């Protein structure tokens, strides 16, 4: 099971990937949106690793359920990122995303999920 610091490092790498892909200015929103979801995934895993009895989820469903049991607001925010990622990649809804949508998703990943989990916010 990776340590909390490893999950934080992955979050920071995902932030760099988001920027490299163009962030909210990207020509192809599906990939920056996907990096935001995986940033949220690693925030959840960082939170789990910091628990007095650390745990590591085995998949998206289990992660959302474990999060809902412990931090329902964070689970709701992660579900928003998950749904956006799926819409952008699998439902070909990438055209539906506007810059303002991506900015909102960025705030969820960088500020709202960390706040709900009592973790340090991410700089994006």
State where each predicted segment sits.
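Terminal alpha-helical segments
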Residues: 1-124
